[in-house]
């Protein structure tokens, strides 16, 4: 999983907002459903994982049931549970969110599922160091004709923080 902060920035949704939490839940619900569905389809062909019988999933109990989280009604969870009870799932473990630093840099998005750590920072890799800058902030500031050398220098002087740069409107803070 990578680029959650990018997706939220592209939708102009603040990372720590209630709306961001809803989007995050929908994304992970979709990933969980798709992984269960595909694992069940593979189990139809190759059989369930060796210790499936007796597992919570074999009884129609999925992760959200164990955490008392109510899924949305976007998917037919009851049907999927029945299919899983009938056919099993091929994988005992389905999703493993982990850091994705190198590939995220290659693909040009924020690593993992975390917020953007700073608007400007130095990234150190085996081949050297390079500056990483929040392109979404630059785009926003350019849209209001505020991206210039003065703002760039203040951003650097403030270690990537815009909180104390008076010229930048609060909506971007």
Q: Which functions belong to the PLM regions below?
A:
Residues 1-173:
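Long, C-terminal-biased catalytic regions of enzyme "large/alpha" subunits
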